[in-house]
């Protein structure tokens, strides 16, 4: 079934604009690692690539929505100059394209695998929506909790936003490739860990712009609310602690996967965040 010519023109424009924005499109290195994972699990390369295309459109849609709601740069002068309704429509169009790609893929997968992939996709989209809602409604001034409650709430937010997106990326590639539940679960959980790390990492790098948004819940603010201002570590110390702990969790999570899959994921993580961390020597 072909789209009407006008629809084709609109969709081509959406793809063109989002793909040329380094801010809104996932890096090629990520997509290459996802493909290596799927193929290493026995997936058909063309089918794995189609899932990655669908995920990329979904990821761009969520990034665009997030940047619009936060007033952040869009990475494309033409898109930035458009009216707000049209900018939001680009996010909707990217989401529509993602679902169209997914439908094309699931139509050729084995029926049971197709159903599982669609369930993973839909449950993840619900998580992303919930995470974005919490990001918009949770206020930093409400983090004056006792103990580690503020950090727990921030961790839940990270899991529902970027964590869920990467759980779908890796889990979806695995689901496209194999019917082995243990492999799909390992890939999905690894994606969750990587996505949460990315949320933390970007948050700590984005401190300057966050100063203009005092009510935005950030890792540093959640850390200070839980640990106490006087005891708060420097940002580099916070990252070192988190990276080491999540790396250890990731290493254990990857155990069921074959060596090529483990290598693809560990190389991806080190490309994103730097060399494997040293053992933890700092205590909270």
Could you say what each language-model-derived stretch is?
Residues 261-284:
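Short, amphipathic C-terminal "tail helix"
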Residues 3-243, 247, 265-269, 273:
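Mg2+-dependent prenyl diphosphate-binding active-site environment of isoprenoid biosynthetic enzymes
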